[in-house]
């Protein structure tokens, strides 16, 4: 609008993680909000201010503006539209803004080449769900590749262990944050072995989080993904 947050530039993305009731599958609340936005370098080092201090002040200003200007406006717009989603935005959400720090260079200059192709052919055809991330053009430092391998590894082991006949494992990440923001499991109502009778998909997901180190660097190390053999 040219009145507030005038330092913003065109390249940006957001990610919202919603917590659901695992029994009714109804949304409970907004759990995490991630906003990555390009911006001017509107605070510069100098006059006793170091480069690191200047960057920290910029990011703190952007975080505060997202929290006090952007999110309240989004909520107000949803309320005016009578959208029930407005009720999911409380005060207890986790907020990450520009988790990797300064984001001045954006658009094609910043991301050219990080694309992909044939994402469905490379994975499960039309049989399984896909989050949209491609393997092509990306090394294993990108969760599009490494976390896809990790989720497949977990799913294969759940089936091999008899936990489910069929299972979907979904991992959600945000740039600059090592741990997944959410772990979702769907066993498609597969029968459980006697020892696991009554265990919900949500409990399986929580156990996955405790048993597996799902940080990208840990996945790379576990599977030896720095070796160019895939």
Stretches found by the model and what they are:
Residues 1-105:
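Glycine-rich, mobile lid/loop segments that gate access to catalytic sites or pores
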Residues 14-40, 109-128, 171, 183-190:
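Short beta-strand elements
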Residues 28-30, 46-48, 107-110, 132-135, ...:
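Short acidic, glycine/serine/threonine-rich loops at helix termini
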Residues 57, 61-65, 69, 116, ...:
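Conserved active-site and cofactor/substrate-binding residues in soluble primary-metabolism enzymes
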Residues 70-81, 138-144, 151, 157-167, ...:
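Flexible helix-coil linker/hinge segments at domain or subdomain boundaries
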Residues 94-120, 229:
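Conserved ATP-utilizing enzyme core subdomain
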Residues 117-119, 124-170, 178-186:
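C-terminal catalytic subdomain
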Residues 166, 173-230:
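Internal helix-turn-beta structural module
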